[in-house]
Amino acid sequence: MRQGFPKARAGEVIGLFGGSFDPAHQGHAHITREALKRFGLDRVWWLVSPGNPLKPQGPAPLDTRMARAKAIMQHPRVIITDVETRLGTRYTAATLDQLSALYPGVHFVWLMGADNLAQFHKWQRWRDIASTTPLGVLARPGDRIPARMSPAAAVFGRARIPGRASQLLGRAAAPAWCFVNVPMVEQSSSAIRSKGGWV
């Protein structure tokens, strides 16, 4: 394995939680712990991205966001990584293509909040992502109905695993996705930035 890349063995189930984490907060940590419990994951990797192509303004410097993420999410089964920067990828589909090639036999699950599912159809190659990687969707307050009514939910409706069977997601063949309602921590990166509590 290349220097600076997380380690994983064939057969492991790794949840991938990507984002700019600008900044990371307790809400991110909470849904990560919930994902570990709900989706049959061995570990979760936080993929701290170099930037978000869907956001017009760039994030704080990567090293600042990485340090904050490591301070917020301290768990023995969670790794904070800048693997997208190391791979030179900017879009989720390209990241997943490269990770699948680098980690043969590892089962990846893409984790997202319900707000991301609601706009998932705007992502580059979103159908490819959903066709090749199981999706674990964690509901946030106010985002449940838009997510369930989203174009992605309609296109992949038959691939949905019921919430009561969420533990099956990690070993499911794609396309597969599961939507779970979890008690949420009311915190957001944009609210932290707007209050001046961040870089």
From Swiss-Prot:
InterPro entries: Cyt_trans-like, NadD/NMNAT, Rossmann-like_a/b/a_fold. It catalyses: nicotinate beta-D-ribonucleotide + ATP + H(+) = deamido-NAD(+) + diphosphate. Its EC number is 2.7.7.18. Keywords: ATP-binding, NAD, Nucleotide-binding, Nucleotidyltransferase, Pyridine nucleotide biosynthesis, Transferase. This is Probable nicotinate-nucleotide adenylyltransferase. Pfam families: CTP_transf_like. GO terms for biological process: NAD biosynthetic process. Catalyzes the reversible adenylation of nicotinate mononucleotide (NaMN) to nicotinic acid adenine dinucleotide (NaAD). GO terms for molecular function: ATP binding; nicotinate-nucleotide adenylyltransferase activity. Pathway: Cofactor biosynthesis; NAD(+) biosynthesis; deamido-NAD(+) from nicotinate D-ribonucleotide: step 1/1. The keyword Ion transport does not apply. Belongs to the NadD family.
